[in-house]
């Protein structure tokens, strides 16, 4: 984001967890100055530490990725001079990033860091609850929270997702929480502690599975399938795997016509209900057809017929994948000292067509001079506790979103005080119909949206567009996950939005981005998982497997949240809004980065302790209960709903969980008074 949205923020990155490294990098990409504290170890000692800390959950497994875009400062707790320099640096910074569960509790280090106003601690279980402070790896957490139980095939065992998705997801939440805390620090002079737990992040990722549990049904694994659509699966062609999604009867008829004319009129498969009852038969027809074809022409054939699909891209192919290459999502740089070529991600946040910046990898201790040149931060007198406003008091947000990405970003903004108006089509959001229901409303819809107000608008009508334009003129944020180009076709391109409101922060989240090699291509979470390396990272006997949780959808929404918070801070300086372009494929590829520069991944890397918990087990776990991760709220008509608490815990300005979203209003509603 140019100028850097978080320019002026100084960050001291001390913790060794992968999530800490991810958080620091995201903040650096948004303009913060990040000093990463590196151990004064030999390379072999560093590698040994990376595999011994919490089962490989250490960022030092790849120094290039851990340090890119940051300033390196070497440190040894046994050296008094290093302790003194750490204290001096902390006094000059706004934020310190920690992972106290795996890095110990050296009293001298704690004393050295105490002058930093914002403490962000990323741990396995957080600071409260019966498991507080206990170390655990990514895969221990996947097993304990039900995430692992959702991944794998129906007739097989649960599988770990072959990537540290919960660590990386926690890093995104931590970065967003840090940006929110910095907003409060600059406004009110109040620092605070941020508590981000992998456990909480994982429970929050179960949005598609928790409703079934609360309806008294057991969640089950579906491999690469879909509980409500057939065919929807991964199939092996002559030259690679492909993911094909048929979401309705019309798409099935198009697919059947390609496979065999006789299949189109087969009454056994005529309706979705018929195909769900004969899942194996339908999959067999598709698999036999795909097996005789090559993947690239098959993708073209299916897309030409309007059938969502995607080749399953391997991780070693990602840098050359056409859309990732166009968006310059992966850069190749030389490692200092060795000269070895390594791959690193560029920024996930594309704003106002800014040029992509290739991050540099710092030589060891190359940031020490810059650290010495800093002056300590002057500390303001903090506001009285009673006068501290919620972070987004008075913020006005429009959301046009279905399913996960935009609703997730807007839900979290609402939890910190924003006034969110969700725009639904005149007939209502299609997710309202998703089973299971309570009082004729989808629990998935409720749990995904949280506390918002809803307005039904027909944006194809003159009256609907006029009402929307009026809302935009008074809004601070517009976040949407419509098919790229949809708003433009409705008469609201970038120029029109700027004319209506030059201060508007507009965030578009889509599968492949506004700038894309795949203009107009439909994208489901599963298709994006196929095309970003996630499915390649998790295989059973060579068969690629999607993560049970909607990793690409969730990540896209999280990055949208972070980008919006950062753009709001930039607006304070420039007075101007921003046009943000988030691609779920970029985010999904970013989640795989720890596999980019390694040639071998051993079974040890996904090892875990203890039994695999079900979604039901996880929802009732003592840690879930103690941290109140699932809370009950009553809607306007008296129905009680289980809802998710935020995984971002700020000590002075905590997020809230308000009453759930009700029915969409057909009468025009306006903004609340600031």
Regions inferred by a protein language model and the residue ranges of each:
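N-terminal helix-loop segment corresponding to the beta1-alpha1 unit
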Residues: 1-187, 285, 366-579, 584, ...
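Flexible, small-/acidic-enriched active-site or ligand-binding loops
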Residues: 2, 333-391, 638-674
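Short, surface-exposed beta-strand/loop micro-motifs that present aromatic residues
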Residues: 64, 230-236, 446, 639
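Glycine-rich beta-alpha junction loops
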Residues: 123-126, 198-203, 239-241, 247-250, ...
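A short glycine-threonine-serine/GTX helix/turn-capping micro-motif
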Residues: 158-169, 191-193, 222-226, 230-232, ...
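Substrate-binding/catalytic subdomain of NAD(P)-dependent oxidoreductase enzymes
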Residues: 181-223, 298, 311-317, 567-606, ...
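Aromatic-enriched alpha-helical interface/lid elements that frame and gate functional surfaces
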Residues: 230-305, 309, 322, 385, ...
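C-terminal core of ALDH-fold dehydrogenases
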Residues: 286, 290, 294-350, 608-651
